[in-house]
A protein has these predicted regions:
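Hydrophobic membrane-insertion alpha-helices, especially the h-region
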Residues: 1-6
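Long, hydrophobic alpha-helical segments that serve as membrane-spanning/inserting helices
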Residues: 7-220
Length: 220
């Protein structure tokens, strides 16, 4: 009787652990889908902002037309210079399974390792690059405000894009310091986009691995 009772309890505990395991993996999978959507939005805007700077620095005959196709207003041009975009993917579900200790139910060491790499290592790299860009952006904004206040004041929705572009382009072409600050920000944006691509590759690889585990468990 004791032996049967013990085996029954062991079976129930194993079943409960398996349910917790599937629940944890499903939660991670849901959040990875959310992060994927977030990264696509970030990538589109990161690339757009960098292209605005590219065309301003190029100063080619088609530069304004190219920028005009990218942004809807003068502030859209100014944003690429005077602001930055954060990188804050949704991580509540991951943080919960860490804080609650339910990460222990995930058997696969490779899944746990890739989760840590994505949410700690690669995330830290991206945050560091965004912080660096923020410092450059602050220097750039301050330099513009101190040396080209009229350009700053033109950065509003009722200013024609062409008017704002012409004023900004004139400033850039006649000021090596301004151009150097813009180029530094442009270069940092390129590094950010490179690491975002790597982050997305790791995310997709991890999501595919989790999907296979769930399929093998008959949970999907």
């Amino acid at each position: 009787g004791v032996s049967a009772s013990f085996l029954g309890e062991e079976y129930r505990e194993g079943l409960q652990n398996e349910n917790e395991r599937i629940k944890a993996l499903n939660n991670i999978k849901i959040e990875l889908d959310e992060i994927d959507t977030y990264c696509e939005e970030r990538k589109n805007n990161y690339v757009k902002d960098r292209n605005v700077l590219k065309y301003l620095l190029d100063n080619s005959d088609y530069a304004f037309d190219s920028i005009d196709n990218l942004v809807q207003s003068s502030p859209g041009i100014g944003f690429a210079l005077n602001d930055y975009r954060e990188f804050q993917p949704p991580m509540n579900r991951y943080n919960s399974i860490i804080n609650e200790g339910t990460i222990k139910f995930i058997e696969s060491d490779s899944v746990k390792q890739q989760l840590s790499e994505l949410h700690n290592t690669l995330y830290a790299y991206l945050k560091s690059i965004v912080d660096d860009e923020k410092l450059i952006q602050q220097k750039l904004s301050l330099y513009l405000a101190e040396n080209y206040p009229k350009v700053i004041l033109l950065e509003k929705y009722d200013t024609e894009k062409k008017t704002y572009y012409n004023a900004l382009s004139k400033a850039v072409n006649n000021d090596e310091i301004l151009k150097a600050l813009m180029y530094t920000k442009y270069r940092k944006m390129g590094i950010k986009n490179y690491f975002l691509d790597g982050y997305e590759e790791k995310l997709i690889e991890l999501r595919n691995r989790i999907e296979k585990v769930l399929i093998n468990k008959g949970a999907k």
